[in-house]
Amino acid sequence: MKFFIALALLGAALASTHLDRYNSIERNIQESSFRAGREYRYLFNGQLSAGLPVPSTPQGISRLQSQVTLQWTDGNTVRMQLQKTRFATSQQESNSMKMLPFERFEEVERMNREHQELLSMPVEFDYEHGLVREIRFAENDQPWSENIKRAVINMLQVNILKKEKYEGAEKSDNQEPTFSFTNVERTLEGECEVLYTVEEIKKEDEQRWAKSINFDKCTRRPYIHHVQTPVCKDCQQTLEQDKMSSTVLNYNITGTSSSFLINSVELRSQHLFAPISEKHQLVSAFTLNTMELIYAGEKKTEIKQVRNEKTSELVYNQESEWAEQQWAQTGEEKYLRQLPQWTENKVEMIKKMFSLMAKQIEQGEAELEAAHTVARIVKVLRECNEEQLEQIYRHVAEHKDEKIAEQLRSIYFNTLALAGTRVTIQQFVDKVQSRKNIAPLKASVAIKTLVDMRYPSLAIAEDIARLCESDVSSSFPALRQSCWLTYGAIVNGVCGQTPRVFVQKNGVKMCPRDAKQRIVDKLVQQFESASTRYEKVLALKTLANAGLDLSVYPLEKIILNEQHETTIRTQAIESFRRLRTQMPTKIQRVLMPVYLNRQQPQHIRMSALHQIIYTQPEWSVLSQIGNQLRQERNQQVRAFTLSLLRSYANNESPCEQTFSSRVQSLLNNIPFSSQEIDRFESVYGKWSTYSRRHQSGFEANFASLFTTESVLPTEMMASIEGVLSGEWNQYFAQIGFTQKNMEKIIKKLLSNVQEKGLEQIVVRGKRASGSFQPTEFLSNLLEKLRITRRQSSEQDPHAFVYIRHRDMDYAFLPIDADSIPEVVRSMIQGGRLEIGDIERVLAQGIHFSASNAAFLYETVRRVPTPMGLPVQFTSKMPTISSIRGQVTFELEPKNGKSFDGLRLRVQAGPRVASTHVLSLRVICPIAEVGTKFLHQAVLNTPVDTEIRMNWEDKVVIRAIYNTPSEEKRIAMIQSRPVTFTRTVAPDARQYPEPIEMTYMLPAHKQLSQSLDREYPQIRVQGTLNRPTSVRIPQWIVDSNVEVYYKPNVEQYEAIFELNLYNNYKMEKNYEKVYKKHNGRRYLEAEPEYDEEEHREQITKKFEWLQNEKVYQHVAKFEIKPEVVKMEVEAVCNNDFHFCKTQIRGEELKATIQYVYPQTPRTVEELKEQKYRQLVVMGEMNYGENTIHININGQQSQEQKKFVKQIEQAPEHETLLEASRLDQYQTVVEYEFEPKPAQYFARYWNMVQAYLRTQYPWTSRIETREEPSRKNMIRATINVEPRQRLTVNMTIETPMETTVLERVELPFRLPTAQIHYQPRNSRYEQKPVMEKIAHHASKQANCVVKSTKINTFDQVAYRNQFTPCYSVLAKDCGSEKSEPRFVVLMKKINEKKEWKNVKVVYGENEIEMYKTEEGLICRVNGEEIEYQPESEIEKKQYNIIWLNKNTLKFDSDDVTVQFDGVNARIHLSALYRNQQCGLCGHYDNEKETEFYDAENQENTIPKFAKSYLYKDSKCNYEREMFEKEENFQRIEKNQEEEKDQEMNYEESRREQDDEPTEQVAIVERQHEICFTQKPVLRCQNGKSQESKKQKVTSVYCLPSSNSWARRQMREIRREPLAQWPEHKLRNLRDQPQMEERTVRVAVDQKCDKFDY
């Protein structure tokens, strides 16, 4: 036994001796300085780790050890050789901040002999005073080996003479002398500024030198950066800071500056990369190198002399990177041979990977490895030559199964484009041109991948141009468009300003100026020779994608050439977008004159401003924009400018913070209101959020540009951007729409529908079209007035829909007469849609099959490390997807005269596999190590759905989903951090799989949750892990979740049924519920009526409802089998003044009902009606939880006072405002189970906390002394009646009372109105979508009074009517010889303000006028007498009696409301820029309002006279039009004279409102005074006459007195008729109160409130 123990100890000792053979080397130092003819040996240890800079997190580590022999020859020449070099790797969880023993690593045992020989080759360098000058390597040495030797030499460089900039401080005798200085040196990592700090140790005769590299001050750095994000100046200061690099060397030196010896060196270096956010740590490459002197003495063995005249420098050699770049850009095989050949069997590797992919396709499942396989194929293809690609292509194209072969070919061509080398692109182009195995449409999609290629070049661009100009592109417009747009993007990658960093060598320019000029000339020539608008736009978008600085000059000519269409000029302005950071000043100089020129089209001006703001101009340009904004008359341009500036001022994007502050300063000096923006459609909006701490953010932009030429938006745009993979992706995605004159097509379609009806448009066979003949009066009117037709732009209707990605035009779709497919045109015959043609098209269905492989994005950074090996950080997202299926349509019933049903079936099998890879690896031909974080997702979601729709009697929609027949995995999500090592054998025939080790946190550092849950038809299983430490991010933790679908039924069916307007008989017991309604429980005082009166009014209301039409509306929703079932039933009368709605579900039952009081027709009826109560009652039961709610709506005293102020306004408008209910009292009784009660209490506490923080001065919460009845909430809401923008609210709960006073709302609050609303039967019978379009299109409003007209564009001017008809509004843009409508008005009595209004609409003539008997209406000569609730229904219009004094003509085009004196005209927005008459030009512009009958801008008198219809039946005073006071514009700030047009009857005249007595406030310097007795003051503050002074007694208090300031606010809100006793006592008790006599202004007469 002892023998075995002794043997074991001996073995351990021998092993220990073997393991530490380098660490136990004896040191023999015989020299004190470097001298010629001597030999020095150092032990070099290098350790390079890749992973997170957090202890005990995954690290992939490379370890290098070697003996370095240095021999000084003569002078300053040094020979160096590496001996006994060893290389090792490790995946262990180690702290890489210290040098680990070599024996803890796994050594590469059989290192390639070639590698050994390369590393042992000698090297010579000039070494003068510690600085390395010229280096000479062996001729056969390779770049990677040279760089390792440079790393060793780099550690010997120290500026021992201290020649350069010196900064030192003398120390005291007790301190060691130290000094520091800076110098610019060439180091392995670049030519940068370095800082030296020297500490001299006198006792030991040593010097400690510290050297650090300042990477912020480098003139040259050998790194590569391939990124797809645009340049962002501010982002470089925010997001780039976290990609830090630091290198520090510590030297131990003995001797003097002329004779020294380096005893030891330690280097620590770290390169940080932020894959997601700074908060969640960074990915780090940490280098630790040490060199320790172990021998200094006589030469043992002579190092061979290097016979190479070529010299190199110390900076990292990028020959390998240069060869890789040149191979990709040029395709010359000499560069391919210079690359490290890691395998000789590339073709066989790719064949096997495609075979594996074919099996996965055959199995019909998307696997996690599919995305990995795509990435590996791309990697190998990037190093394949033309011959190898042909072999691979033959293998892919010759698969036995044609369906699988089709998908493989599609993936292969995608990978060719993803590889992005010139050789792969040439094969792609050749195959597309030969039309072999790739359809042009698929080629047009695949070629888009080249937009973000890694190594673009002019040679590759010319290859793409060859495809663009080929016959196959000419035959397929989609391919031609994709080709040219991609060509521009590739040119931009080579010649434009991008964040890419390429390898530069020997001053070779990738894009010389003459090459750029040729490209610009080529594209400009293409633009000039284009015969169609589409071709011109394509050329401009290609120029935009190219982003060449030389394109500015031809683009400027196009923009300023007014002979070009507006669309072309706008596209030329958009073509500046890629130059906004490269040439901002030039863009501003070109576009600022365009924006400032008011003669330019509005669309061009707004587009120019948009691009100017994108350049983030300096203050000088912004001040010009602000000055233009102050005087801008074009309302659309002004609104767009304001909204654009406001959006940038409030922006949080890190790319625009500096600019945002400048814009905010500009807006602070420009007064504007949000209403100026909201009133107009042209608007620009931004919504952004950004967290600097988390380095995450998102921004959404939206813009709509409207002009006076069109009712449709001229341009609309929406875009998104944000942080992705640690970079702010500006202009990430954008979609837009631009159009010109498309309203022509829409208007024709709407006109056909209005004239013929939809049932005559969609027919089975052709029908004869009807005719239209104008009336004799209309013909005479047009002939005498000679009204010139308003013509829109002569350009034919056209539009473009475009998509942009990363600020590049990705695709655009032209829409015009030529682009409409022939199949659609054949369906339209004689202006009608033939159902038979529709059925034939739909019967064909849509069959689709597609497979795609793509990198959603790819970012690569390669940085050299001080160990001589580069590290590469890659962030990419390889994705593979496929889909096969079909869509079929059927109309029901088949072959019928019409159709009332539709059947749609969708069958598809989409499959997606995607992997987000964050990888940091050490690039070395011996062995690769690294760390990567994999986030993978797989989706397999088969779809088999059928939708059936029927609308014959009621709307029924059935959706049937057929489930899979067996259990299927539909989703899988996995997160996996791994460290890996890879050793490549050149003769390997399969892709070298790395040895991976998944990192798992220890149990005490993570919370694990196992998932094994089953839901109906769904099973979820997997493991979720969450770190316990905030330093460890979630995205590096291993997790896995799988979702399985388990069918237990064959299909699901969802049914939605809608049945409206069913006749219903009112039940008598409905009124019983309302009679129980008790007002005594409400919070406020008792109402003005008692309970008996309440019951009486309810009885009357329901008696009236018994004679009304009552309808039942039912909506049902159900999912079978028994998942959800819901039914909603509403019983309402025709005008919805009574409605009872019931909701029935499985556990939910709810009822809500309301009833309006009697609805008055006139103000007089409203005044006589005492009962004005709206009663709402509701009840809800859900399980054991119940809620009862009662709401009482009525009018407050403030509302009634407001009604008195507007009683002289036009009657119908008065009724609208007077009938509003502004006070709502609510009682809620509830019974909750414990858990819902807890939720309710929690949410109510959150609401109270919000009120305390948001409204601290206007809210208070009072605890009740005696808690009231439990489970009851009472509330009162009072809405301010004038603007309805503020509310007072009191909420009483059982324990407390919450009071809110004058809370401002962001919008005008709608309130209930109890006035009579006439029914429009013709309108009610329209389809829902037609109702919405009808309502939305009625935008313009013109008010015509006796002496004042407020036009459609809100321009007020004075006007005088005569006994002759004047044209108020007319369709002046109709393409037919006769207009669709004309509205005329004349004065019929000289002494009275009575008017006559005539409406000519089609073949009909409607005349309305005032007489002694009242309002008269004639339709085509037949008199219509007034009858309450009467309505004249015609096919195209209605005539409605609102009340005995007001009549309304209603049609789809125009609506006229007339009360005998005043008229209000509503006009459809489709007539914008096509209306003429006294109601103005109607183009949303106030400066172009007065266009006369000949379509010329004129003075107001001549404008009014041009629309006067003179005949033998009328005479007028010609002098009237010569008096300027009769026709003049009324400005907002101009005081208006008394208007006689507000009279309705002969005896009614404007009466001055008498001032009332109230307490007045006198503000004086440093004090506030209140009158002791009331004085006369106007209610609305508007005095009509000059005020008089009166001497009165006042109470005065200091202005600092809070009580006085509060009283002042209250009195101004609610005037006091006299002082209440309690307030008077408080006033007299105030400190420093004084009584004195002063003069106070007293009002004599007041202006009425002009509604």
From Swiss-Prot:
Gene: vit-6
Native species: Caenorhabditis elegans
Positions annotated with a glycan in the UniProt record: 252, 1288
Gene Ontology molecular function: any one: nutrient reservoir activity
Annotated protein name in UniProt: Vitellogenin-6
SUPFAM superfamilies assigned: Lipovitellin-phosvitin complex, beta-sheet shell regions, Lipovitellin-phosvitin complex, superhelical domain
Ranges for region Disordered: 1527-1556
Keywords: Disulfide bond, Glycoprotein, Secreted, Signal, Storage protein
Main location: secreted
